[in-house]
Amino acid sequence: MGFGGGSFLIGKLYQAWTPAGVGGWRTSFLVLGIVCFAVLAVCSFFFVAPGADFTAPAVKGGKTVSRPAAADVTPGQMLKKTTFWLYYVWAIAVSAAGLALISQASGVVWQASADQAAASVATIVGLISICNAVGRVLFGGMYDKYGRSLSMQLVNGLFILTSAVLLLAMSRGSVAVVILGFVLGGLAYSGVTPTNSAFCRAYFGPGHYPVNFPLINTNLIFASFGSTVSGALYDAGGSYNSTFFLIIGLAAVGIVCSLAISAIDKKGN
């Protein structure tokens, strides 16, 4: 939650203190870099590794959906599994969709309503971060209770719904509908990170989790091109609708990957 909440807060502060002139961002970035370094340096002293006898508390509460405990899989073995690559492609696709939306968010608001103040635009765009923060908790609980398939498909479905809502917002020039689209988009993107961690542990075990999980997170190297592609599409067509159709296409790839993993699970069972 700190990731999303911090993004919203820093975005507002950045908008307030950064000069409008060319290169005004340099001082703001320098200050942010110093502050981040100081916070990390101080907080690092409060982290203590658990002892060898530490045992995580048992899960309490209602009914949960879980697959049989996975045997510990080494990173090399994981890279040979079809389920890993299907999930990896899913993570790339939906992460790229989220980054494409975030990179074009302020422009989407301006195109829907050109008379918005800069502070208002920052607040509206910040809703993506807020919903990203809240949604991570919701999706973490959802994976525990309903399992991988529903969690992945809900992310896919929310991205498609986000694009449909934003296409409607562009056609009507409605900031209110843009806000709804950003709320949905933030929730959609929020499901990626908790699903990454839960999937890694459920399918490849806890023994090599410290290496396996970062390997899954390397999807962001490729997903980062989502913002580049969406920017190129806007430059070519002068409309953000192309970005929304890109997001729909990426979500469709995600649907196929999730269904393929389900098919492999059924064969394995």
Model segments located where?
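Membrane-interface helix caps of multi-pass secondary transporters
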Residues: 13, 17, 104-115, 199-200, ...
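Symmetry-related core transmembrane helices of the 12-TM Major Facilitator Superfamily/SLC fold
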Residues: 26-46, 244-260
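C-terminal transmembrane helical hairpin of 12-TM major facilitator-type secondary transporters
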Residues: 97, 120-199
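Transmembrane alpha-helical cores of Major Facilitator Superfamily
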Residues: 1, 92, 126-130, 157, ...
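Interfacial helix-cap and linker-helix signal at transmembrane-aqueous boundaries
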Residues: 7-20, 109-110, 142-143, 230-238
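Flexible cytoplasmic inter-helical loops of multi-pass small-molecule transporters
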Residues: 49-72, 268-269
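Extracytoplasmic gate region of multi-pass secondary transporters
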Residues: 7-10, 76-139, 226-230
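A late C-terminal transmembrane helix in Major Facilitator Superfamily
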Residues: 3, 189, 203-237
